[in-house]
């Protein structure tokens, strides 16, 4: 496999897409995070009964954020825990929902997993979107105003979850990591880059990178933006300018913790050249696992097992 991967990595290096970071990108996010943290954190806990109660304890958490939305998450830790433990903050893929990660907890760590707002779970999106919102499509919500765009909201929610993890009495705040694939891979990067709580970032098949190219191709969740611009071509420059503030290809420059990336050469959603461009622009300590025939929608066992051994050793 090594020769095949090396040949493909050399080809990917020639296709790296440059960053298009706005000059005020850092200030934009500093302002947004300041606004988020100006809202005092409130966490409501309720013990849950699950099929895994013999080995782990689980609570439902209801958390306030920067707007009227209430974020709902599940927090689990080993049932026999007697001291503060590491915590994996898990971010799910697009249009999925939180889960009970008994496999992660079995490594001896806690796990926190939130429902991303507006994607079918319990976190109902209460934000006011003054523009876009074509047929309820997520990526057109607030599209013309970067201060009210959907991605701004879920990125801030991801940072909020890191604040939650650091506040929980069961968690050692010095041993928090982020983990996710696709949409979750992007949120993992954002949460590790901006929260100040992360020890390490794990990101698989990261979405929300090279957004301009995804809009041009009309792939997956960005097909709605492509359709919007067909209808309103006069908004093209404004939309592309706004999207640059949320492209993790640009935001990855703020990532300072060690990060493990993973891409599949058969991925037709988050294309290999997109994910490799993201990896290329990261300035932190980093590794990348390139899997020759792995498509989207599947967290590879090889990456997962290596990561779980690291969880066990935290």
What are the residue ranges of the model-derived segments?
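Hydrolase active-site cap/lid region
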Residues: 185-234, 290
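N-terminal cap/lid segment of alpha/beta-hydrolase-fold proteins
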Residues: 35-83
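Gly/Ser-rich "nucleophile elbow"/oxyanion-hole loop immediately N-terminal to the catalytic nucleophile
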Residues: 137-182
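Short beta-strand/loop motif that positions the catalytic acidic residue
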Residues: 254-256, 261-263, 267
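Histidine-bearing beta->alpha loop at or near hydrolase active sites
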Residues: 285, 290-306
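N-terminal targeting or regulatory segments adjacent to alpha/beta-hydrolase or S9 domains
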Residues: 1-56
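Acidic catalytic loop of the alpha/beta-hydrolase fold
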Residues: 265-270, 296-297
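Cap/lid segment of the alpha/beta-hydrolase catalytic domain
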Residues: 102-105, 110-156
């Amino acid at each position: 496999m090594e020769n095949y991967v090396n040949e493909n990595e050399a080809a990917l290096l020639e296709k790296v897409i440059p960053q298009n970071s706005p000059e005020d990108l850092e200030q934009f996010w500093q302002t947004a995070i300041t606004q988020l943290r100006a809202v005092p954190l409130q966490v409501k806990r309720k013990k849950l009964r699950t099929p895994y109660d013999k080995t782990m304890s689980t609570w439902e958490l209801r958390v306030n954020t920067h707007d009227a939305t209430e974020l709902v998450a599940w927090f689990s830790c080993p049932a026999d825990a007697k001291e503060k433990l590491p915590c994996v903050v898990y971010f799910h893929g697009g249009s999925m929902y939180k889960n009970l990660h008994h496999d992660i907890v079995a490594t001896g760590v806690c796990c926190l997993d939130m429902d991303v707002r507006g994607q079918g779970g319990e976190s109902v999106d209460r934000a006011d979107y003054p523009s876009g919102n074509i047929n309820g499509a997520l990526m057109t919500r607030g599209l013309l105003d970067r201060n009210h765009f959907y991605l701004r909201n879920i990125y801030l929610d991801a940072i909020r979850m890191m604040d939650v993890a650091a506040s929980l009495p069961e968690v050692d705040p010095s041993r928090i990591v982020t983990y996710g694939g696709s949409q979750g891979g992007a949120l993992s990067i954002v949460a590790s880059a901006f929260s100040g709580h992360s020890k390490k970032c794990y990101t698989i098949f990261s979405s929300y990178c090279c957004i301009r190219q995804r809009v041009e191709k009309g792939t997956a969740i960005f097909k709605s933006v492509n359709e919007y611009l067909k209808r309103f071509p006069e908004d093209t420059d404004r939309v592309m300018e706004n999207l640059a503030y949320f492209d993790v290809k640009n935001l990855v420059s703020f990532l300072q913790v060690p990060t493990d990336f993973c891409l599949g050469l058969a991925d037709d959603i988050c294309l290999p050249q997109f994910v490799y461009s993201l990896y290329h622009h990261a300035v932190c300590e980093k590794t990348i696992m390139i899997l020759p025939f792995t498509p989207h929608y599947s967290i590879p066992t090889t990456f997962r097992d290596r990561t779980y051994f690291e969880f066990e050793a935290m």
